[in-house]
Amino acid sequence: MKVVLIVCLVWVMAMMELVSCECWSQADCSDGHCCAGSSFSKNCRPYGGDGEQCEPRNKYEVYSTGCPCEENLMCSVINRCQSA
């Protein structure tokens, strides 16, 4: 019984952590993060580092597969961050 209780407690804590990262807009995310994902499941994600997946910045700040790159990096045509 104790094991079931511990497993349930860990599961609830994990779900709370996932929910706390959800976002509706860029304003919901901290510095260095963007709001990205599908219409039904957006999460705050870190800006892309060198070689990581990215999406070019856009005026609407709407991203589906990844965030823009960190400063001094640009998003290449293959959606990977690289030196500008």
Swiss-Prot record:
It comes from the Eukaryota. It holds the Pfam family Prokineticin. Residues 1-21 form the signal peptide. Keywords: Disulfide bond, Secreted, Signal, Toxin. InterPro entries: Prokineticin_domain (IPR023569). It comes from Cyriopagopus hainanus (Chinese bird spider). GO terms for molecular function: toxin activity. This is U8-theraphotoxin-Hhn1c 1.
